[in-house]
């Protein structure tokens, strides 16, 4: 994605890169099918799947787990706040407000994506320093709110500042992995798979709800000369920041682990 996609789209049109990605994805899927075993050597190959009644009962136990609700609420917005900016609004913002072409936008987004990956690794190191998963998540959430507030309140920032803030946002907002780890700690081993899946359901839900919300907000602003005005993007950054604040308020009731 990002720079490679922008370069290939300029050279071949947008369809060819997507066909290429589809082929690579298919090859990876075939490799996974051929190379991954259902039963590693350390597992019981004779184990039978649970009956549906036990599966549903286990899911009910997961939903009733103390401490799940605040973790679910925070995970609803944590990853979505990053992905909505990186995957949806960063490129239009850089084009409409700062006049960047597709390759230049791709370069910024490439660095944003790299920052997100680095952030995931960095949060694993940061958690022991801060002393708890809860403190780490709150730190990341407050940092996200701060970056969104700057982008929302700063009219016409210079390009270097806008791009830097977008990269910083992806770096700071990559604390979702800590929420997943905290959620895993709520469940016994036999419920671990269903428990983590339930926690990640919040991430998936947020990643389609927040883009819809921000898209409706952007659409409420009339275009000027065929472009979305800066005020629409600033309102969107404010909306994302407010959503993170609401998630943090709910998350304060989570267990300290």
Which ranges hold each PLM region?
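Multi-pass alpha-helical transporter architecture, strongest
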Residues: 30-35, 237-257
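Juxtamembrane intracellular "pre-TM" segments in multi-pass secondary transporters
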Residues: 39-72
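Cytoplasmic membrane-interface "Motif A"-like loop-to-helix N-cap segments
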Residues: 128-142
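C-terminal ends and interior cores of transmembrane alpha-helices
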Residues: 142-156
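A late C-terminal transmembrane helix in Major Facilitator Superfamily
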Residues: 186-223
């Amino acid at each position: 994605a990002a720079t490679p996609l922008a370069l290939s789209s300029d050279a071949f049109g947008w369809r060819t890169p997507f066909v290429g990605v589809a082929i690579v994805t298919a090859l990876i899927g075939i490799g996974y099918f051929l190379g991954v075993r259902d039963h590693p050597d350390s597992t019981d190959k004779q184990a039978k799947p649970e009956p549906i009644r036990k599966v549903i009962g286990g899911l009910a136990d997961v939903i009733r787990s103390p401490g799940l609700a605040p973790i679910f609420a925070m995970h609803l917005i944590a990853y979505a706040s990053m992905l909505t900016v990186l995957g949806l609004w960063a490129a239009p913002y850089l084009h409409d407000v700062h006049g960047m072409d597709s390759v230049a936008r791709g370069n910024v987004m490439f660095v944003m994506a790299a920052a997100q990956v680095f952030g995931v690794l960095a949060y694993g190191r940061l958690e022991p320093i801060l002393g708890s998963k809860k403190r780490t998540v709150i730190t990341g959430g407050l940092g996200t709110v701060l970056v969104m507030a700057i982008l929302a309140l700063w009219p016409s920032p210079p390009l270097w500042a806008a791009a830097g803030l977008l990269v910083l946002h992806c770096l700071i907002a990559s604390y979702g992995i800590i929420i997943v780890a905290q959620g895993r700690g709520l469940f016994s081993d036999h419920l671990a798979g269903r428990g983590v899946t339930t926690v990640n359901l919040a991430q998936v839900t947020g990643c389609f709800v927040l883009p819809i919300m921000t898209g409706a907000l952007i659409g409420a602003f009339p275009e000027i000369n065929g472009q979305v005005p800066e005020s629409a993007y600033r309102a969107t950054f404010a909306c994302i920041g407010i959503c993170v604040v609401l998630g943090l308020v709910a998350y304060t009731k989570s267990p300290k682990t």
